[in-house]
């Protein structure tokens, strides 16, 4: 019965530019993923619709097309696995780099989406990979290396204006975490102010980017906050204060964004060595009892700021708080133990 209605839709109702065609193709592929007879035809139909819509390069469809590609990627892996075809990272890469019907030289935005799909799946495999044996650890290291290589290729082969919003965010975030974080700024700026010269296409691109604007603001701030240029760090601090003000005045504030902005203020003011500002920003983070994600680091940075202000007792309380509450979090408990011992020695020799 499902197959009957599925076939009738493609015969009578399918139209180029229809969001329903993308949605139905994705839903059908998911529905048939355990069906030996229907999974491959459903996959081919999904490929055809993705390519048809992607070749039009319509910015109004970009976000929906990205979602369709992401859906295709997950279901393609799950369906092949259900049918006993386990695809390794190289098989996935070959499939998406040579996607049926795509001209990688001409269909730049669609090609970038497909590249990003490979990266996302490889990252997911890396994150889930076990590390119990030497062989497993070697496999995980190989996946990590492949992710880095794929990002290098993505940056090399595409201009910022070629890239759809999700890809801009992911590549920007990756670059923001490297030794040259400011390389990421162009990717975030493309979301905040697209370089598209045609006003109609630019408006459509801006509308498509809107759901990623906050990611771009925070990503750009992180990149600037890691700069060695104090003026750029000051810009990052202002960006986070502006975001906090915006959320605080909103009738429906984004609590996650507020926590992230407050945490970034602690980090950026610490990088700026503005110790009173670090203490104040950390106090505000700690005042909100729902803010827990980065609390150990906030406590540590505030403890360092107290040390710089020669407030040794307050610094000790922070370091002891970390060692007492977050023993298992070695990233912060280990330096907190050393800082605690050093602070005790300083206090006792004064």
Task: List where the protein language model places each region.
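Acidic, polar-rich low-complexity tracts and alpha-helical solenoid repeat scaffolds
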Residues: 1-350
